[in-house]
């Protein structure tokens, strides 16, 4: 009788269902996932146009890569920021790297990561004026910075809150504004106009045909150069 009870007890232990433990997750990974989800939720799906980028054609002109040819495929600003990569392909945005490039710049714009001029506030017909704001830093020194103000107003006439400090530009000497795409207008004044490819990420170029063909291309070039040298020396 006792041996029978021992056998039943042993069988019970063998066939007892095991509790499935939840996979352990590092606390840091959970925190990172929550932060990423929160950040993504906070970003607007459709960002607002800016004074320097008021519409689809301007956006596509700025980011370059000849994407402005596709401007008529986006009937609205909302369409530009909501179409999926499959929809872009159906509309004829080719090649695939052009779609990837457009999607990258869409995300940057959502995050407020603009190119040159993206932070400008006073823009008219795609042109912004940059002027020099002088301020006495000490009895012996005057600080000068480049600001964006309305074209028909002097810097002193514009309130402090309306003077937009422009990133990427500085004052050289006393009255010269220097920076990308800055066109001098007169002493202490420059203008910045929307230009094709202002924000473009420049692509690298393959040297000697790329990684796989490089050795072959360089070998053939060496053969041709040696042959030309022998011909020049009269060996042929």
Curated annotation (Swiss-Prot):
The keyword Metal-binding does not apply. Its main location: mitochondrion. This is Small ribosomal subunit protein mS41. Component of the mitochondrial small ribosomal subunit (mt-SSU). Mature N.crassa 74S mitochondrial ribosomes consist of a small (37S) and a large (54S) subunit. The 37S small subunit contains a 16S ribosomal RNA (16S mt-rRNA) and 32 different proteins. The 54S large subunit contains a 23S rRNA (23S mt-rRNA) and 42 different proteins. It comes from Neurospora crassa (strain ATCC 24698 / 74-OR23-1A / CBS 708.71 / DSM 1257 / FGSC 987). Signal peptide: none annotated. InterPro entries: Ribosomal_mS41, SAM/pointed_sf, SAM_Ribosomal_mS41. Keywords: Mitochondrion. Component of the mitochondrial ribosome (mitoribosome), a dedicated translation machinery responsible for the synthesis of mitochondrial genome-encoded proteins, including at least some of the essential transmembrane subunits of the mitochondrial respiratory chain. The mitoribosomes are attached to the mitochondrial inner membrane and translation products are cotranslationally integrated into the membrane. It comes from the Eukaryota. Coiled coil: none annotated. The keyword ATP-binding does not apply. It is found in: Mitochondrion. Pfam families: SAM_Ribosomal_mS41 (PF09597). Belongs to the mitochondrion-specific ribosomal protein mS41 family.
